[in-house]
Design a protein with these regions (language model features):
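Short, low-complexity N-terminal intrinsically disordered segments enriched in polar/charged residues
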Residues: 1-25, 29
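A beta-strand edge to alpha-helix "cap/lid" segment located at domain peripheries
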Residues: 9, 34, 40-108
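A structural signal for short, well-ordered beta-strand elements
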Residues: 16, 39-40
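Generic secondary-structure microfeatures
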Residues: 27-30, 35-37
Length: 108
């Protein structure tokens, strides 16, 4: 089981350094991330936006954590966009995250 704080730290370190190896070890080869609009990206597309820069996450709060999923919130700071908050639901199987769903709300 990957703890929520472990994956948050890896994701933030990836965004900070633009080095996907920090996060990649926690994601399955068939990893999918679904955004607020319902658009689904694969592992390669996730890597692309993670290493592009201009995005940071912070203020992590775990709501629920089990061996199969986590539910949490965090804030996002992204160049050219208002600050936002994200609700995350993420599933893991066999020690890797396979699915990540976000609901993102921007400040007015």
């Amino acid at each position: 089981m990957i703890l929520a704080n472990t994956v948050w730290e890896a994701w933030d370190k990836t965004l900070e350094t633009k080095d996907f190896t920090h996060l990649e070890k926690y994601l399955s080869a068939d990893f999918q991330v679904e955004d607020t609009t319902g658009e689904v990206d694969n592992l390669e597309n996730t890597k692309s936006w993670c290493v592009a820069g201009g995005l940071r996450i912070n203020n992590f709060k775990t709501i629920r954590e089990t061996k199969n999923y986590i539910v949490a919130t965090h804030d996002v700071i992204q160049e050219g966009k208002p600050n936002s908050s994200v609700l995350v639901y993420a599933e893991q199987t066999n020690g890797k995250f396979t699915y990540w769903k976000i609901q993102r709300a921007f400040e007015a």
